[in-house]
Amino acid sequence: MIYGIGTDIIQIARVQGVMTRTNGRFAEKVLGPDELAKYHARKARSEKRGLAFLATRFAAKEAFSKAIGLGMRWPMTWRAMELMNLPSGEPTAVCHGELAAWLAERGLVVRVSVSDEHDYAVAFAIAERSGAAVSQPTAL
């Protein structure tokens, strides 16, 4: 059953501007450790691909946070969710710490899709309740 959906679009030039203003620290704030390693590898090959990677991950985290209904509030933090890729190339949300526990308590699984083209990066997320038994809130 669908729990929530989220979408986000960002102009890649905005990400480039923030990176310039923060002297590159924006990537360290937004990306988890595995994402950051992948970002640095892509950036080393092509500045443009590095920026597109960062923009898609930023958009994915925004879409993810909307789909779970928290926005960017605890336990949803920038680094608590990393968007990685399965061997097939399919993106997969890898959650850590309290966010992983929060999702498990609610029986939520979130699927994320990202894309980028020239000037923009976009992400879409669908949060679904898994088939596992989940405690329902009691009526007041």
Curated annotation (Swiss-Prot):
Location of this chain's protein in the cell: Cytoplasm
Q: Name one GO biological process term.
A: fatty acid biosynthetic process
Where mainly located?
A: cytoplasm
- Which cofactor does this sequence's record say it needs? Mg(2+)
Tell me the residue numbers annotated for binding Mg(2+): D8, E62
Q: Which reaction does it catalyse?
A: apo-[ACP] + CoA = holo-[ACP] + adenosine 3',5'-bisphosphate + H(+)
Asked whether the UniProt record includes Cytoplasm among its keywords, one would answer yes
What is one term from the GO cellular component aspect held by the record? cytoplasm
User: What UniProt keywords are attached to this protein's entry?
Assistant: Cytoplasm, Fatty acid biosynthesis, Fatty acid metabolism, Lipid biosynthesis, Lipid metabolism, Magnesium, Metal-binding, Transferase
The record's Gene3D superfamilies line, in alphabetical order, gives:
4'-phosphopantetheinyl transferase domain (3.90.470.20)
Q: Which GO terms describe its molecular function?
A: holo-[acyl-carrier-protein] synthase activity; magnesium ion binding
Q: Which SUPFAM superfamilies match?
A: 4'-phosphopantetheinyl transferase
Q: Cite the EC number.
A: 2.7.8.7
Reading the lineage from the top rank, the first entry is Bacteria
Family, similarity comment: Belongs to the P-Pant transferase superfamily. AcpS family.
Stored HAMAP family: AcpS
**Which NCBIfam families does this one have?**
acpS, pantethn_trn
Protein's name according to its UniProt entry = Holo-[acyl-carrier-protein] synthase
* Record organism: Cupriavidus taiwanensis (strain DSM 17343 / BCRC 17206 / CCUG 44338 / CIP 107171 / LMG 19424 / R1)
Query: Source taxonomy lineage?
Result: Bacteria, Pseudomonadati, Pseudomonadota, Betaproteobacteria, Burkholderiales
